[in-house]
Amino acid sequence: MKTIICGAGDVGYSIADKLSRENFEVTVIDEDENRLNKVSENLDVKTINGIPSMPSVLENAGANDCEILIAVTKSDETNMVTCQIGHSLFKIKKKIARIRQQDYLKNDWKNLYNDENFPIDAIISPEQEVAKGIFRRLISPGTIDMVELSDKKLKLIGLKCEDNFLHSGLSVRELSEKFPDYLANIMFIFRGDQKFTVNSSTKIEKKDTIFLVVETDNLTDVLSEFGHQELQAKKAVIIGGGNIGFSLAQLIENSETYIKTELIEANKERAEFLASNLENITVTCGDGLDNQILEEVNISDSGYCISITEDDEVNILSSLLAKRAGANTSITLINNSNYSSLLSNIGVDMTIDPKIITISKILEKVRGVKIRNDYSIGEGFGEVIEADIQSESFLCNKNLKELELPKGIRIGSIVRDKKIIIPNSQTVFKENDDVVFFAETNLSLIHI
């Protein structure tokens, strides 16, 4: 499938890498030759140096027979115009654009994006997606992440096996046998600096961070068995009132789950805007690195401190200060992925990388109707994907024993006729099964 990616930054590069592994015919356009050199040296894709919104550049990239256009340059306007030209001149079927500026995304202008105006088929807003990701964590105490799957019948959760985890040393199979009534399946583990896909004989240890799929109705019981009985946080402090902070505050304000929330914003004009547009959130104008400000918002009583300014260093330091002052859990926005592996060792509980979230949402849109959800994990370690099994899939009408799947793929669950199945070696896959699976990054998903 011929695909043009406009923008060779971290997001564009990662998408090109993923799609080229799945036999997409990818061309990457960028104005920066250094970025393109990195792409061409490492990936099996074509590169074009030029301005993506110029018709001649798109034509040179193969737009006349292109099926998917992905615009992820640093400019919203370039992304929007590129999609317009891709539609008007080249009749490209699917156009996906990353748009950051929230003014373009207001409900007042929702009719802007259609074939008569800006023909963009899917808009990805990193700020809104990050806010949703943080909110999921707030309403899922005991987890480090949570994603709803299979029409909310299942959840993908990440959790840490704390010192009060009573089943340390048991294998995945032994845990399943010990709790046969729980519809849950462990898929992969982070252990220190190691990340690996599990099999039935993998033993679970204290301090492991595990990711599993679990039936929504069993979630509380499963969390309890892993040593988590945390209550819903009653208070949160947000540091940073930019687009992400504002979007998160709105989600909290409109939620049925009550969380008393304080928001700290350094810019006076922005703080006044936030205060006038948020009804139930207390806004304080000040520096999130100022201990006096942290005391003023009673950080010591907070279940969560959420540091989401545009500055990684400010986010890290404010999280550490908040933890030292008594905040229970820190959530920290990190744009530089080089920091992520270091932070858990110095007291930062959870990190959010906007690039990973953006990449997941774009891949979900690219892969088409058979993909329901796509969630990237662990700084490029792999993806959890929810997909409908197609008749041509190599999974269809075979069981796991026959398939001999590669080591880095783990099937988590099947939903068939609204019934949840945790698969074993004899489970046969059927057409239209809703399957959740994990695949490490280096594995091609083209036949799934």
Regions found by a protein language model. Give the residues of each.
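Cytosolic regulatory regions of ion transport systems
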Residues: 1-446
